[in-house]
Amino acid sequence: MEASRRWPYAAWFMAVLGLVAVFSSSEAYVFYAGGRDGWVVDPAESFNYWAERNRFQVNDTIVFLHDDEVGGSVLQVTEGDFDTCSTGNPVQRLEDVAAGRSVFRFDRSGPFFFISGDEDRCQKGQKLYIIVMAVRPTKPSEAPEPAGAAGPVSSKSWSWQAFPPAGATTPPPLPPSWGSAPEHAQAPGKSSLGGSGGGEMSRSSSLGAPPPTSGAAGLAGVVASVVVGVLGALLMF
């Protein structure tokens, strides 16, 4: 009789732990192409160099901030069209979710290529390629990877393995307006958008989103500790 009373508590406990696990493993991050300078022509820092300093995973999102009045459209293209700045047959033309804001969500691992919708602007450096890493489950007993395994891609002659996203689902639709930049990334000011974007832009301003913080994981640990304590107290009676 006593054991049958404990079953509902055990089931409730397992359900909560499942929710905590999902919460702690479903984080996705937002990156602004080019950092605070935005999607500009002739950037002070190459967009590809900016991408090498960041780590992209499946379900992350990249935002292209541009000035509509100077042809700041964004195209996803093949590698061949990326090399030649060909805009005639894009894989996808990114739609604006708000004025001057084009958004793309990475739904798989592997390479992605983006160029300006204006071929002349693409030739001046408004182009970007990104290598997206697959989401891999954490294994406590797994041996550490070699020192250079997770380093940045040094050139377009990369070597990578494409892993299907583990349990990845289609993310919810984006809101009609992207109201504000996330806490870990700053949107560029109006003065840094459009124009030539030449030598006046400092390299230090081309910062991407910093590495993810451990706030969600810490919260998950607190929740799990509280649940264990409550369950232990209930089983004492």
UniProtKB/Swiss-Prot annotation:
Q: Tell me the function of this protein.
A: May act as a carbohydrate transporter.
Instruction: List the protein's name.
Output: Early nodulin-like protein 1
Q: Name one GO cellular component term.
A: plasma membrane
Q: Which InterPro entries match?
A: Cupredoxin, ENL_dom, Phytocyanin-like, Phytocyanin_dom
Proregion positions: 207-237
Q: What family is this protein classified in?
A: Belongs to the early nodulin-like (ENODL) family.
| PANTHER family in the cross-refs | BLUE COPPER PROTEIN, EARLY NODULIN-LIKE PROTEIN 1
Lipidated positions per record (GPI-anchor amidated serine): S206
Q: Please give the Gene Ontology molecular function terms for this protein.
A: electron transfer activity
| Principal location listed in the UniProt entry | membrane
The protein's superkingdom reads: Eukaryota
How is this protein situated with respect to the membrane?
Answer: Lipid-anchor; GPI-anchor
- State which tissues express it: Expressed ubiquitously. Accumulates particularly in reproductive tissues, especially in maturing seeds.
Cite the SUPFAM superfamilies for this sequence.
Cupredoxins (SSF49503)
> What are the record keywords, sorted?
Disulfide bond, Glycoprotein, GPI-anchor, Lipoprotein, Membrane, Signal, Vacuole
Q: Which residues form the signal peptide?
A: 1-28
- Span of domain Phytocyanin: 29-134
Low complexity compositional bias, start-end: 140-152, 201-215
Location of the protein in the cell:
Vacuole, Aleurone grain membrane
- Disulfide linkages recorded for this protein, renumbered to the chain, are C85-C122
Q: Where is this region: Disordered?
A: 139-215
**At which residues is glycosylation annotated?**
N59
Hydrolase among keywords: no
